[in-house]
C-alpha cells in the first residue's frame, strides 16, 4: 500500500472498478482527506494533466488502454452522528462505502435510506447520481453536501 497522496505510475484500474475492467493509469494516487483530494486535483490541473476522480468504481468502464492522466481514488473515511431532537444528523466522508452506511442506519433504527441497500459505490457519488430505489432516493434525506 502506498502512502496517501503519493503518485504511482502504471497502476491497473481493474481492481478499482466493480466490473473489474481497466488498464493502467498513467499516474494514480489515493486521497485520504478532502484537503489531499483538492491538492492532487489542483496540481494536475495546473500541469494540464487529465484527471479522473474515482469513487467506488461502479458505473465506470475503463478501456484496456487505461487512462492517460492522473486517477485520484477517494479514500477519505469517517462517520459522525449528532442527535437533533428526534432526528439524527449523519455526516459521512466521501470514501465511505454506501451500503455499509445504509446498514448502519438500519441497524441504529434511523429511517430514510433503508430502501437504498445493495447499491454499489461510495457516499461521495450518491448525491451526484441521486441514488434511488423503491420510491426512495437520497435527495429526500440529504441535508447538505460539501464539495
Regions picked out by a protein language model, each given a short descriptive name:
Residues 1-147:
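Anion-binding (especially nucleotide phosphate/pyrophosphate-binding) glycine-rich loop
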Amino acid at each position: 500500500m502506498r502512502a496517501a497522496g503519493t503518485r504511482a505510475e502504471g497502476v491497473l484500474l481493474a481492481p478499482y472498478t466493480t466490473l473489474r475492467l481497466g488498464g493502467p493509469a498513467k499516474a494514480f494516487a489515493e486521497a485520504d482527506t478532502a484537503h489531499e483530494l483538492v491538492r492532487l486535483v489542483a496540481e494536475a490541473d495546473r500541469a494540464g494533466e487529465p484527471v479522473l476522480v474515482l469513487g467506488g468504481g461502479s458505473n465506470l468502464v475503463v478501456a484496456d488502454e487505461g487512462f492517460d492522466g492522473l486517477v485520484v481514488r477517494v479514500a477519505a473515511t469517517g462517520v459522525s452522528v449528532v442527535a437533533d431532537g428526534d432526528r439524527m444528523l449523519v455526516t459521512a466522508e466521501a470514501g465511505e462505502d454506501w451500503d455499509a452506511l445504509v446498514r448502519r442506519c438500519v441497524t441504529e433504527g434511523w429511517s430514510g435510506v433503508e430502501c437504498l441497500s445493495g447499491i454499489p459505490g461510495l457516499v461521495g457519488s450518491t448525491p451526484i447520481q441521486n441514488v434511488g430505489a423503491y420510491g426512495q432516493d437520497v435527495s429526500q434525506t440529504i441535508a447538505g453536501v460539501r464539495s
